[in-house]
A protein has these predicted regions:
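Beta-strand segments within the central parallel beta-sheet cores of soluble alpha/beta enzyme folds
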Residues: 42-52, 79-85, 107-112, 176-182, ...
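Condensing-enzyme catalytic core mediating Claisen C-C bond formation in acyl metabolism
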Residues: 1-24, 138, 149, 168, ...
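Active-site-proximal alpha-helical scaffold in enzymes
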Residues: 84-114, 156-190, 230-236, 336-359
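Extended C-terminal subregions enriched in glycine
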Residues: 269-292, 300-303, 333-339
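Conserved catalytic cysteine-centered active-site region
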Residues: 2-4, 18, 55-107, 115, ...
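Acidic, glycine-rich active-site loops and adjacent beta-strand->loop/helix elements
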Residues: 12-15, 51-56, 85-89, 112-119, ...
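Short glycine/threonine-rich loop-to-helix capping motif typified by GTGT followed
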Residues: 56-64, 256-260, 288-311, 339-341, ...
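Conserved active-site "lid/cap" helical segment
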Residues: 1-88, 96, 162-174, 195-201, ...
């Protein structure tokens, strides 16, 4: 856990609608953009923390991925530490990077990069399933029978189970889930770095092909290539009008708690650590692997009351310029995209973009405090990792 502010000196991110770039090319682009934004020279860096999930399976690089993909980036001999934490690799890297930046003499570079489009869909799905314990996968296959679902994914089967749980326990409707997808894709259509470039309607979401159970294709995140980077440093190096990571809390599940209960437990620890509550935030970037999960997570985190997130979404309250908390102004995983190891960093980049007044047509006006929530992996129904960052505007 951390509470001392860490300055976000610079940010960088690739266009997540592209599929034609290598992991190395994307890493270089995000890194040099972040360094340029920060005005930091490579020789000033004290550490690089690099996150990736699927490089072993999809890029034939089982180890030393950060060193391999950055060896021609001109960073010299700065130490590179690699992080692999499934969908939460970038969030984990930011957590580690913020801890180091607080104590280090030089800035810390945090990078997340993922290459998911390789032409081998089965290999990508298998890599995603590595986010489950090996001795748990057979049980998951037997339970969710991916061969019987159009999407062919046990994790989308699990997400359908959660969607139905949210509908049965909280009164969420399929129209409310579709409304979350519409919001995500509209926000993404105004985000020049997003995977999705076209807005949609509730009817189009509901009519799109089935993935698993109640979930349709337009309600779900999809494979994404992308990279995102942060340059972090001590608060006294922050430029005027900058943004700061003012809190970071992380928890790992061990199979003893329900996934959404783990979200709630981690959120309560975050509020205590941050010294603020769920009502203090202007915007949140969260892990919407599906649009149903957006609604379920909002309530599990305590950002909305039981059964309230779905109606608020349908009413437009969570939209940019809506009456309430702005949810996933980037478009989230469903709209911006979900390049696993880069997702958590992309969330923080998005919050910093708004806090620095750089959001363009999707700017969350007057935002002063944002929340980034990301998860990775599933341990017997529990979240393997939950990471929460609070990001604030400078004074």
């Amino acid at each position: 856990m951390s509470t001392e502010p860490v300055a976000i000196l610079g940010t960088g991110m690739t266009d997540m609608s592209r599929r034609d770039q290598s992991a190395e090319t994307m890493a270089h682009q995000a890194v040099h953009e972040a360094l340029g934004d920060a005005g930091v020279e490579p020789h000033e860096l004290s550490l690089v923390v690099a996150a990736n999930a699927l490089g072993g399976r999809l890029c034939e690089q089982g180890c030393i991925r950060g060193q391999t993909w950055l060896r021609k980036a001109g960073l010299g001999d700065v130490a590179v530490v690699n992080v692999d934490n499934s969908c939460a690799g970038g969030t984990s890297a930011a957590h580690v990077g913020s801890l180091v930046a607080r104590a280090s003499a030089g800035p810390v570079l945090v990078l997340g990069v993922e290459k998911m489009w390789t032409g081998d869909r089965a290999a990508t799905l298998a890599g995603i399933e590595d986010g489950l314990p090996a001795d748990y996968r057979a049980d998951m296959h037997a339970r969710f029978r991916p061969e019987e679902n159009p999407g062919g994914s046990i994790l989308m089967g699990l997400n359908d189970f959660w969607a139905r749980q949210c509908m049965n326990d909280r009164g969420t409707t399929v129209e409310q889930i579709a409304a979350a997808a519409v919001k995500a894709r509209y926000n993404a259509s105004r985000n020049p770095m997003a995977q999705i470039t076209k807005a949609t309607t509730i009817d189009e979401v509901l009519a799109s092909p089935q993935v698993a159970g109640v979930l349709t294709r337009l309600m779900c995140s999809s494979f994404t290539d992308g990279a995102a980077a942060l340059v972090l440093g001590p608060a006294d190096r922050a430029p005027a009008g900058g943004a700061f990571i003012v809190g970071s809390v992380a928890r790992s599940g061990n199979g003893e708690m329900d996934y959404h209960d783990r979200l709630g437990e981690t959120a309560r620890a975050a509020w205590e650590t941050f010294g603020c509550g769920p009502g203090d935030f202007d915007m949140v970037e969260l892990h919407d692997a599906t649009s149903a999960e957006e609604i379920y997570a909002l309530e599990s985190l305590g950002l909305f009351g039981h059964g309230e997130a779905g109606p608020a979404t349908l009413a437009g309250d969570t939209a940019i310029g809506g009456r309430g908390l702005t949810v996933n102004p980037s478009g989230g995983l469903v709209g911006r995209g979900h390049p696993l190891g880069a997702t958590g960093i992309a969330q923080i980049v998005e919050l910093a973009t708004h806090l620095r007044g750089r959001g363009g047509t999707r700017q969350v006006e007057g935002a002063r405090l944002g929340l980034a929530v990301n998860t990775g992996g599933v341990i017997e129904g529990d979240a393997a990792y939950v990471g929460i960052h609070a990001v604030a505007a400078g004074r």
